[in-house]
Amino acid sequence: MRRGAIGIYRIFAGSDGASHIEELRLEEHPELGALTNIHEVRVQQFDGTRKRDFNPLPERRLIIHLSGEVEIGTSDDSRHVFRAGDIRLMEDVTGRGHTHVDRSPSSAVYVILKD
């Protein structure tokens, strides 16, 4: 995956229930630049100790990383580190889900999306 000025990544469950990560280009997904289906927005800080095994999320969310590093793992055992400036569109609300490991204290904006 390339590292540009803004990295936008989608984490989703495939038809087989396995989780996957794909990079999105904002110019190909303009809807990400003007979200109107927002349920809640919150800013959160974490102390760097979260470590979760595979789990799906309870709702779709967009996560905008402000500081720190977070590692997300998918069903095929690939891992991706997200840093300040990266954006994750989390859509793996079914299936096996993903793993999560804080690599440092971090902060992020959580945008909870309506379906």
For each feature predicted by the language model, list its residue ranges:
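A short beta-strand-loop-beta hairpin characteristic of the jelly-roll/cupin
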Residues: N55-P56, L62-A84
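Short solvent-exposed loop/turn micro-motifs enriched in small/polar/acidic residues
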Residues: R3-A5, N55-P56, G73, V93
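Ligand-binding loop in jelly-roll beta-barrel domains
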Residues: H39, S75-D86, D92-D115
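A short, N-terminal "cap"/entry segment at the start of jelly-roll beta-barrel domains
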Residues: M1-F46
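Conserved short histidine dyad/triad with adjacent acidic residue
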Residues: L26-H29, N37-L57, H80, E91-G95, ...
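Preference for bulky hydrophobic residues occupying beta-strand positions
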Residues: Q44, I64, I72, Y110-V111
